[in-house]
Amino acid sequence: MSSVAIVRQMDVVQGMLHKSVIALAIVPTNRSLTVTGRKAYSVMLHLAQMQAAAGTESADGGFAAPLNSILRGFGATNSISSDAKKYIDQMVSTKVEWRPLSKSEQQLPLTFGIDGKEEGGSPAQITDELRIFNLLAEVRVYKRAGENWVTWYYPPSIREELVSPSRWAQVDFAVLRQLTTYCAVALYEICARYRDSPAGVTSRQHWSWWAESLRSSPTSKVRAWRKF
């Protein structure tokens, strides 16, 4: 059995998401990302992982689900349901910068030629990378038998790592539903990566890394956490 198949089996856990490290510490760069949009994104990731594990994703690489199943996944209210398309639009139009939680998570080799190797040497490893991408590449919203459905696609360069992650945080939707601010959701998801860490602590980061990773908007003021 391949390692991909094993990871996909692990992801099929009701109420739990194995969220890839590339979707944890993300910083919006061009517009705000709301707490509802971030929660919906996690639910859609979980649905995509379940469909990939069952082999039911579409032939063109997309994933589909009734809109109501996405909303129910994070306990949406009726008032949120009426604005669902707005939150889906956020995922397509919001560009985010990925902040690796540790240096070891910058795994991709730099490419210098056709073979991806420096002349006379082994592949060079990335040490400091700026990586920006949209959360979703494309979304289609339509009706099927009178019910609203959504089909979505991930950017091709990160699709497999999102659907079958090699490194992840285990996110509990029961906890996610109780969190009401973007900062709380972002902090929970990042810290969930270290739930089973022997040291019981996160990786060491500069305070500015945390301030930016917990912000929902590139224009919001940095919050002084000594003041509540």
Identify the role of each PLM range:
Residues 1-228:
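Charged, alpha-helix-forming regions
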